[in-house]
């Protein structure tokens, strides 16, 4: 029987991050690679390693991050905007959270969880 694993790929301004989860959404693998502005080859290498590590496996894959839109289009994979992705994960796994501050290589984002979700972003730089 072929198993299915779920993959999240975050392509940021400086790095590519991957998480692999089993059918029960337990984390079974993560990796973090600097892409040195070569996102295409870094994504290919990360996905090739995944296929080698988990042969005879089907994958569901979604991409997020500031550098993921073009990759998702090229690979014909779903793209989820990074603030939406973060919000969904926090609501599901840490529902008692009041606020999330996410610092990336390109920007900083803050999400307030209250009666109404409020999101703010500094697009100038992460600092």
Description of each model-found segment:
Residues 4-10, 60-62, 96-101:
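Short glycine-aspartate micro-motif
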Residues 5-41, 45, 118, 122-124:
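Short glycine-rich, Thr/Ser-proximal phosphate-binding strand/loop in the N-terminal lobe
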Residues 10-14, 65-66, 103-107:
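A short acidic Gly-Thr/Ser loop motif
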Residues 23, 32-35, 50-84, 111-121:
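Short beta-strand-loop/turn "lid" adjacent to the catalytic site in phosphate-handling enzymes
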Residues 41, 51-54, 94-96, 104:
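Short, intrinsically disordered/low-complexity patches at protein termini
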Residues 42-45, 49, 70, 88-92:
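Alpha-helical scaffold segments in soluble metabolic enzymes
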Residues 81-127:
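Glycine-rich phosphate-binding loop of actin/hexokinase-like ATP-binding domains
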